[in-house]
Swiss-Prot record:
Domain bHLH: 264-314
Protein source organism: Arabidopsis thaliana
Subunit: Homodimer.
Keywords noted in UniProt: DNA-binding, Nucleus, Transcription, Transcription regulation
GO molecular function: DNA-binding transcription factor activity; protein dimerization activity; transcription cis-regulatory region binding
Gene3D superfamilies with a match to the protein in the record: Helix-loop-helix DNA-binding domain
Any Pfam family the entry gives: HLH
Protein name: Transcription factor bHLH62
Gene designation per UniProt: BHLH62
């Protein structure tokens, strides 16, 4: 049964021996062994036995040596995996060898030694009942069996008359590709972990992204974006010059300046740089309006030079005007305290000066009293109104007019609050004493003796 299953993979034939288990098949073969063999057919039977045995042994060795696929989708008796099927098959074959006198030992196993065939009687029975197609000893059969074995494919499930309870699945279409199983166990975990579809998809994506980056369409699109960004401020300038109040571009928002990587620039960085340059240009326009003749200059460097020259000229003009004001207003440097201390009363002789003024006042009063009494005695008819000469009165008036008035002193006092009252009284007494001395000198020029003049 196993021979037919392997040799006719994917082709359903009516089984020769329909037995529920392997033990019944063994009993039937043992019963056949006791029957006599026809000697006329012995040569042909043994030749067929040798050919079938060599083909079956090569197929079985390739089946055992080929690795089983890791992802098995069928289950045997509720237990998933192909190991169960292989164990049952090897056990059955071993039992067959034990029955015919070939035991599996260390040096003689069922894999290395040729397996014994059933007796000639059984071969005759199978020959007569079901004619099997003879297979030639093709050396590439083992490789094909290892690659496309009935256990690794889904054709094994298509057999409905098999004794194993296997879930039936739809057959494989011709358009689908068979998964190639790795021949060595070292590469099997790598093939199981890395699916072929994902790796090929990732490689294709990488190639597509590289081709898109290097394509001329991407380069042209980036250039168009840069040209649009450069043309935006130019449009704003043209609209401002023409006086159009409508804004062609929305006002930019305030962006945070982010430090970009080396050799790269982010969108926020470029926008923030553009906003900063626009603010600088606005301030330059304000300066351009303030500085006369700066509108004729083109370029920021020349504009800055003109502004610097204009500021320096303004500074020179301010210095010249300050010097002119200081030369015109001389009273600003006039120090009243220094003049009073030097000319009117020195600080060292201040007390002596007060004493001399008081002595002059007392002596003048005594002299005036004596002179008045003598005039009354000599000229009793002259009234008291004509005592003073009218010339003397005119001279005294002119002299008083030249003297500083009290208003002048009050102005100086208001300007200098630190001026003391004692100094003010001394100045007033000094003025009155001088007036009296002049009157005495003019009135008694003819009458006062010479010794009085010497004392004065």
């Amino acid at each position: 049964m196993e021979n037919e299953l392997f040799m006719n993979a994917g082709v359903s034939h009516p089984p020769v021996m329909t037995s529920p288990s392997s033990s019944s098949a063994m009993l039937k073969w043992v019963s056949m062994e006791t029957q006599p063999v026809d000697p006329s057919l012995s040569r042909n039977l043994f030749w067929e036995k040798s050919t079938e045995q060599s083909i079956f042994d090569s197929a079985l060795s390739s089946l055992v040596s080929s690795p089983t696929p890791s992802n098995s989708n069928f289950s045997v008796g509720g237990v998933g995996g192909e190991n169960v099927i292989m164990r049952e098959l090897i056990g059955k074959l071993g039992n067959i060898g034990d029955i015919y006198g070939i035991t599996a030992s260390n040096g003689n196993s069922c894999y290395a030694t040729p397996m014994s065939s059933p007796p000639p009687g059984s071969m005759m029975e199978t020959k007569t009942t079901t004619p099997m197609a003879e297979l030639s000893g093709d050396p590439g059969f083992a490789e094909r069996a290892a690659r496309f074995s009935c256990f690794g494919s889904r054709s094994f499930n298509s057999r409905t008359n098999s004794p194993f309870p296997i879930n039936n699945e739809p057959p494989i279409t011709t358009n689908e590709k068979m998964p190639r199983v790795s021949s060595s166990p070292v590469f099997k975990p790598l093939a199981s972990h890395v699916p072929a579809g994902e790796s090929s998809g990732e490689l294709s994506r990488k190639r597509k992204t590289k081709s898109k980056q290097n394509s001329p369409s991407a380069v042209s699109s980036s250039k168009e974006i840069e040209e649009k960004e450069d043309s935006d401020p130019k449009r704003c300038k043209k609209s401002e010059e023409n006086g159009d109040k409508t804004k062609s571009i929305d006002p930019y928002k305030d962006y945070i300046h982010v430090r970009a990587r080396r050799g790269q620039a982010t969108d926020s960085h470029s926008l923030a740089e553009r906003v900063r340059r626009e603010k600088i240009s606005e301030r330059m326009k304000l300066l351009q309006d303030l500085v006369p003749g700066c509108n004729k200059v083109t370029g920021k460097a020349l504009m800055l030079d003109e502004i610097i020259n204009y500021v320096q000229s303004l500074q020179r003009q301010v210095e010249f005007l300050s010097m002119k004001l200081s030369s015109v207003n001389t009273r600003l440097d006039f120090n009243m305290d220094a003049l009073l201390s030097k000319d009117i009363f020195p600080s060292s002789n201040n007390l002596m000066h007060h004493q001399q003024v008081l002595q002059l006042d007392s002596s003048a009063e005594t002299l005036l009293g004596d002179h008045h009494n003598k005039n009354l005695q000599l000229n009793p008819d002259i009234s008291s109104n004509n005592v003073i000469n009218p010339l003397e009165t005119s001279e005294t008036r002119s002299f008083i007019s030249h003297l500083p008035t009290l208003a002048h002193f009050t102005d100086s006092i208001s300007q200098y609050s630190t001026f003391s009252e004692d100094d003010l009284h001394s100045i007033i007494h000094m003025g009155f004493a001088q007036n009296r001395l002049q009157e005495l000198n003019q009135g008694s020029s003819n009458q006062v003796p010479s010794h009085m003049k010497a004392e004065l």
